[in-house]
């Protein structure tokens, strides 16, 4: 199935946490004939379509027609996490008769955008299971939490809003007498005894469904409003690109790979983030399973290429002065190639040319993004993955507004174009003279 704006809406609404992103992608892969491999098991030496999951990260590859040890990799990398408000380990508070859940900002969250929203809870419970531990996804889509704004009449300064993340972003969830703890309530909703919960990785999510909005063009809405576009839009586009790659073309000299990592928003320095050994170890095991050696693996990296797929800033109509004037970026105008001389993005001339060629072959326009020199620039998994693996890397994305807000905005028509460009990147022969 080709990537569509409706498909992205369904993907996001099904995936309120990084754990759910991996579960959603895994479900699609299993339905397409992929087989899940556990890292602790011996991997088969038969070429095929496989994926492996490490907590909130996943790597999938299609080596069904490519068993040769020198076939290069074509990789799309993205991240599964988004800035949000997470539940503290001991969250229960009683303040002025209100039952309060203490929350912690995750990543560069735009705090004010989370105020006065109906919030659900999602994440993972680690539960005692006999003599061991099992991990269960949890999702509550009822509006049980809300972070209330201060009334304007009580504000010290009505012209600006300053939020203290320790004092001002805790959520209310009731009044009066309450016997159970918040984690106990979540456990009960998940069908688990509270006493059996050994750990809880819980976070809030906005309950407003993703939506196609704006003026219609040929009967189709032009804009897509949703939470977590950064970076679930890239996870979805990369997943659809991998699934759409023609299997027969895999015998022409490459192995397409999708790698989606947790913890990008907090630096990627975790056991399953982009700074971990996850991608490099999976790639090496693919080579070893095909009968190759570590020498074959190291040689193979030099001919491989990675597209770090993360969302890009569209020029904001209300703040055009915050953007590089000679590099305007529009929504519904094609994928974005991101360049930064100080390597906040991993793109160089070689990889930029490769992605430009992929866009041409996909028949989609491409835009080029440069950040203002007088503003600090964010980064991606691109430089980290490139440094970890040595694989030539290009940073790309789709244009959006309101990045890191609880609710973000992108062009509806960019979804298909973005995925088509990534598919061409995975499937095109990008040889050099």
Swiss-Prot record:
UniProt GO BP: proteolysis
GO cellular component: cytoplasm
Domain of life: Bacteria
Residues reported in the UniProt entry to bind Zn(2+): 79, 153, 404
Molecular function GO labels: aminopeptidase activity; metallopeptidase activity; zinc ion binding
Membrane-spanning ranges: none
Species for this entry: Mycobacterium bovis (strain ATCC BAA-935 / AF2122/97)
Catalytic EC class: hydrolase
SUPFAM superfamilies per the UniProt record, alphabetical: Aminopeptidase/glucanase lid domain, Zn-dependent exopeptidases
Pfam family, one: Peptidase_M18
Designated name of the protein: Probable M18 family aminopeptidase 2
Family stated for the protein in its record: Belongs to the peptidase M18 family.
Xref: CDD domains: M18_DAP
Entry cofactors: Zn(2+)
Annotated EC: 3.4.11.-
Keywords on record: Aminopeptidase, Hydrolase, Metal-binding, Metalloprotease, Protease, Zinc
């Amino acid at each position: 199935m080709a990537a569509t704006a409706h498909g992205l809406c369904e993907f996001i609404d099904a995936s309120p946490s990084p754990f759910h992103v991996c579960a959603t992608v895994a479900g699609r892969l299993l339905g397409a004939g992929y087989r899940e491999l556990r890292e602790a098991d011996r991997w088969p030496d038969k070429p095929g379509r496989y994926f492996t999951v490490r907590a909130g990260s996943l790597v999938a590859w299609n080596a069904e027609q490519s068993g040769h040890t020198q076939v290069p990799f074509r990789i799309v990398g993205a991240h599964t996490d988004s800035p949000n408000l997470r539940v503290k380990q001991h969250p229960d508070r009683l303040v002025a008769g209100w039952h309060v859940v203490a929350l912690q900002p995750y990543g560069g969250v735009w705090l004010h955008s989370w105020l006065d929203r109906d919030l659900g809870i999602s994440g993972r419970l680690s539960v005692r299971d006999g003599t061991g531990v099992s991990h269960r996804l949890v999702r509550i889509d009822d509006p049980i939490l809300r972070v209330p704004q201060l009334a304007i009449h009580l504000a010290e300064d009505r012209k600006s809003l300053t939020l203290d993340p320790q004092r001002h972003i805790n959520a209310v969830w009731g009044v009066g007498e309450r016997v159970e703890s918040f984690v106990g309530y979540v456990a009960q909703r998940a069908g688990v005894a509270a006493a059996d919960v050994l750990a809880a990785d819980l976070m809030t999510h906005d309950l407003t469904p993703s939506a196609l909005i704006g003026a219609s063009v040929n009967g189709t809405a032009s804009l897509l409003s949703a939470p977590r576009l950064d970076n679930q839009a890239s996870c979805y586009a990369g997943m659809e690109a991998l699934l759409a790659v023609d299997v027969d073309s895999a015998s022409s000299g490459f192995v397409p790979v999708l790698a989606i990592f947790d913890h990008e928003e907090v630096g990627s320095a975790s056991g399953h983030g982009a700074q971990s050994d996850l991608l490099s170890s999976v790639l090496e095991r693919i080579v070893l399973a095909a009968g190759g050696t570590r020498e074959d693996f190291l040689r193979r990296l030099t001919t491989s290429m990675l597209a770090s797929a993360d969302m890009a800033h569209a020029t904001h109509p209300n703040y055009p002065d915050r953007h590089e004037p000679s590099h305007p970026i529009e929504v519904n105008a094609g994928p974005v190639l991101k360049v930064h001389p100080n390597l906040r993005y991993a793109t160089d001339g070689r990889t930029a040319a490769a992605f430009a060629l992929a866009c041409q072959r996909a028949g989609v326009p491409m835009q080029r993004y440069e950040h203002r020199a007088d503003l600090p620039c964010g980064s991606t998994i691109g430089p980290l993955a490139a440094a970890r693996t040595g694989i030539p890397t290009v940073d790309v994305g789709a244009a959006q507004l309101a990045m890191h807000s609880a609710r973000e905005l992108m062009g509806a028509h960019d979804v298909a174009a973005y995925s088509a460009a990534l598919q061409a990147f995975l499937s095109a022969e990008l040889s050099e003279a």
